């Protein structure tokens, strides 16, 4: 099972996180399948590769709670719904 979760980077007391698609059995610092975003809680900056996130969500990846909240702020789930409705109408 693939999860979208945070991977810690940065130095002591200055944590920044990468949003990665990773196998659920891997540890936090394990090898990721793909980097799909970036989150800096200190500067409150976020970057999301929305097409990559949508790809993994459509394939069944489960986001963790924090990644879900970050994605909701970036309005990823509204784009996911739009893609699903377009797919239904095209069939």
Swiss-Prot record:
Its main location: plastid. The keyword Manganese does not apply. InterPro entries: Ribosomal_bS16, Ribosomal_bS16_CS, Ribosomal_bS16_dom_sf. Pfam families: Ribosomal_S16. The keyword Amino-acid biosynthesis does not apply. Gene3D superfamilies: 3.30.1320.10. GO terms for biological process: translation. It is found in: Plastid, Chloroplast. Keywords: Chloroplast, Plastid, Ribonucleoprotein, Ribosomal protein. PANTHER family: 30S RIBOSOMAL PROTEIN S16, SMALL RIBOSOMAL SUBUNIT PROTEIN BS16M. This is Small ribosomal subunit protein bS16c. The gene is rps16.
